Amino acid sequence: MPEEMDKPLISLHLVDSDSSLAKVPDEAPKVGILGSGDFARSLATRLVGSGFKVVVGSRNPKRTARLFPSAAQVTFQEEAVSSPEVIFVAVFREHYSSLCSLSDQLAGKILVDVSNPTEQEHLQHRESNAEYLASLFPTCTVVKAFNVISAWTLQAGPRDGNRQVPICGDQPEAKRAVSEMALAMGFMPVDMGSLASAWEVEAMPLRLLPAWKVPTLLALGLFVCFYAYNFVRDVLQPYVQESQNKFFKLPVSVVNTTLPCVAYVLLSLVYLPGVLAAALQLRRGTKYQRFPDWLDHWLQHRKQIGLLSFFCAALHALYSFCLPLRRAHRYDLVNLAVKQVLANKSHLWVEEEVWRMEIYLSLGVLALGTLSLLAVTSLPSIANSLNWREFSFVQSSLGFVALVLSTLHTLTYGWTRAFEESRYKFYLPPTFTLTLLVPCVVILAKALFLLPCISRRLARIRRGWERESTIKFTLPTDHALAEKTSHV
């Protein structure tokens, strides 16, 4: 284990062979680093490659010197803090007290705290690591920075990872110096204010997909509900009433029946809050009143809900491709062939069923293709290359087309099954009839908002008109242009 811990995170061969990480001249700006861990090694490598002269302070420089790039000077901590004006403190919070013996040499210098607490420590301590470091060294200027950047991102530089570096501190000159260093290293500094903001900055790396929690719980809840419903209809009912064991359907067949239901409902929930927001604006007669908190949060989570809808739809397509590979499907084909022979039927063809299958498969492929476009354009690299009109056209117009195609796909799949008594197992309606409720409401509401008497009023409200205002307001001549200026 000790031998494995001594292995460098960054290959020295790569460091010495990379021309961008060559030795820097003596007149280069000097930067100090206290610490010899993985982050300190990556930081030293990036600083050397950015043209800085790096001095690393270690308690055992002989053992750790070979782990750093050859251009970095590794020495004792007392010598490392003597000349640099900016010193990175790359040690954990519990080791801050071991640096108190250097307080005289550190007086007047800029200390850059790059540490991160654990989730338990973050909740336990009232003050941030940076504020605690500032209390131990009152004669120094402490700046919080680079704590959201991983060792790998530092190693890769601006070619990979998130380039934004939140920076906070009480001295503008110190923040400016650290910001210039971040720019020289290929990152984008973001001023987060005073050192009191360090607690919030340190919480950033601890967050685990905060915007995805509610949509994920929603998708899981829908999946569990529809899965239980399909289990009762497709597995439990034949077992209870017909003594047929169909529990083999649970891993694939029931899952494949559940996934499109979840995807369809999630897609409708992407556009339902926009309908509710438009109805609320029409009722209030103004756009200057805030939406309720629940609606505001719903609107902010539409992207995540839409991506989960696409994920479920893609899984449904994959599961559908796997259906013919099942052994149960092969047995069904053999049994059907035997029944056809026993019935002395040489030709089995139902024109209505053939057309229904062809149509609903085609509509399903079109819906999935449209959803794929929505998913691709939601990527930041693609979304940033589109102007507002292009982005709103894809996400709003094409998204609504995807919802309509999904509705037609569901209707052609169901066909006349909703009116057949045999489909109501345990007096429960077919699953697809339950999924149609919310999407049909959204489609009908969207169609209602397209009526001229409503669309013109909504367009005026979104351009600043208020029902209670006495100021006269007229739409521009190009009404179509006015409608495209705002989308909810």
UniProtKB/Swiss-Prot annotation:
Heme b binds at residues 316, 409. It is a multi-pass membrane protein. Induction: By p53/TP53. The keyword Cell cycle applies. Pfam families: F420_oxidored (PF03807), Ferric_reduct (PF01794). NADP(+) binds at residues 36-39, 58-59, 91-98, 116, 151. The record marks 325-326 as: Cleavage. Glycans are attached at residues 256, 344. Fe(3+) binds at residues 229, 319. It is found in: Endosome membrane. Proteolytically cleaved by RHBDL4/RHBDD1. RHBDL4/RHBDD1-induced cleavage occurs at multiple sites in a glycosylation-independent manner. Changing residue 229 to A: 2.5-fold increase in Km for Fe(+3). It is an enzyme of class 1 (oxidoreductase). The modification Phosphoserine is found at residues 11, 17, 20, 486. FAD binds at residues 152, 160, 281, 302-303, 378, 395. Changing residue 344 to I: Inhibits glycosylation and does not inhibit RHBDL4/RHBDD1-induced cleavage. The modification Phosphothreonine is found at residue 474. Belongs to the STEAP family. This is Metalloreductase STEAP3. It comes from Homo sapiens (Human). The gene is STEAP3.
